[in-house]
Amino acid sequence: MSDNSQKKVIVGMSGGVDSSVSAYLLQQQGYQVEGLFMKNWEEDDNEEYCTAAEDLADAQAVCDKLGIHLHTINFAAEYWDNVFEYFLEEYKAGRTPNPDILCNKEIKFKAFLEFADEVLDADFIAMGHYVRRTFPTAEEIANGIKPQMLRGLDSNKDQSYFLYTLSSEQVARSLFPVGELEKPEVRRIAEEQGLITAKKKDSTGICFIGERKFTEFLGKYLPAQPGNIETPEGKVIGQHQGLMYHTLGQRKGLHIGGTKGGGGNEDPWFVGEKDLKRNVLIAVQGKDHPLLKSQGLLASQLHWVDRTPIKAPLSCTVKTRYRQTDIPCTIIPVDDENIKVIFDEPQIAVTPGQSAVFYLDEVCLGGGIIEERI
């Protein structure tokens, strides 16, 4: 085992069990470990779903238990400028963005890494993400071999989908200790070590904004624009409060349950399309409706982990949303900025604004933003 005692790692301490165990494991591996807690949202600190104070207290308790120093940093301005404004613009345009991916790109692996470098003199940063990475030898690096990002060992928790915007240079500076473990093992280690976060539930909801009623939250920043819900034939069957509150393939929240379709069809209703020009939500019946199906997609804002654009058709797999089963597909380059993706089998609810992330077996190649379905 290599001597890590001269290498400093700054761990992103979120106040959760994954970052807590990451810090412990790195300590056990001999690194000089320090923690850094990020505060990235200040709009409604006093509301009941803001857990920043509790999370900081838990992070501090874990660091005290492990005997490591905890730094704090406020990235709220960077989060607003580089993540949240994009999030709002995409919703305004009728698309469904994924702010967690942008948060990883702009905050956790950019602003955080820069602060860890410039202020804390870090050799590495570490996060509690469920991904793995390769460690090329010095000889391999000299021959141009770059670190690769791999899926997490726990397929149910794998978070590589959210990290596809990392470059191989960022991967080289990052450690992911829990990526080599399954979640129950992480909780077991936390309990064995007496860490306060051992039984703390996993956070869900928008990155750094927490768990809250999404419609109510979005309505604080974007004015609602109610309109009709129609069938593909143009029959008005209900009202929506705003296209931004709905995503393709959505079933819940349409409030048209019990409405029968043509010929007395009682199949459930799904969001099939958004007509932005008319501010109309098109609802269809049955998850196999043709409007829900796509043969492929067009993607832009491409990012490849090794920074090498794909120049020729490539057979691989793709995820168009988190925790989706891999979809066999072929990537067809249009140019360095755009690709066409053809699925082996038609897919349901491919959503513009979301990310398409590509894999070759365990390796995450990168991805792009879905512009349209085809």
From Swiss-Prot:
The record marks H129, Q354 as: Interaction with tRNA. Signal peptide: none annotated. The keyword Disulfide bond applies. Catalyzes the 2-thiolation of uridine at the wobble position (U34) of tRNA, leading to the formation of s(2)U34. HAMAP family: tRNA_thiouridyl_MnmA. Keywords: ATP-binding, Cytoplasm, Disulfide bond, Nucleotide-binding, RNA-binding, Transferase, tRNA processing, tRNA-binding. PANTHER family: MITOCHONDRIAL TRNA-SPECIFIC 2-THIOURIDYLASE 1, TRNA 5-METHYLAMINOMETHYL-2-THIOURIDYLATE -METHYLTRANSFERASE. Belongs to the MnmA/TRMU family. It comes from the Bacteria. Disulfide bonds join C103-C207. It is found in: Cytoplasm. One of its GO terms (cellular component) is cytoplasm. This is tRNA-specific 2-thiouridylase MnmA. The active site is at C103 (nucleophile), C207 (cysteine persulfide intermediate). It catalyses: S-sulfanyl-L-cysteinyl-[protein] + uridine(34) in tRNA + AH2 + ATP = 2-thiouridine(34) in tRNA + L-cysteinyl-[protein] + A + AMP + diphosphate + H(+). InterPro entries: MnmA-like, MnmA-like_C, MnmA-like_central, MnmA-like_central_sf, Rossmann-like_a/b/a_fold. Residues 98-100 are annotated as: Interaction with target base in tRNA. ATP binds at G12, M13, S14, G15, G16, V17, D18, S19, M38, G128. Pfam families: tRNA_Me_trans (PF03054), tRNA_Me_trans_C (PF20258), tRNA_Me_trans_M (PF20259). One of its GO terms (biological process) is tRNA wobble position uridine thiolation. Its EC number is 2.8.1.13. Residues 157-159, 321-322 are annotated as: Interaction with tRNA. It is an enzyme of class 2 (transferase). It comes from Aliivibrio fischeri (strain ATCC 700601 / ES114).
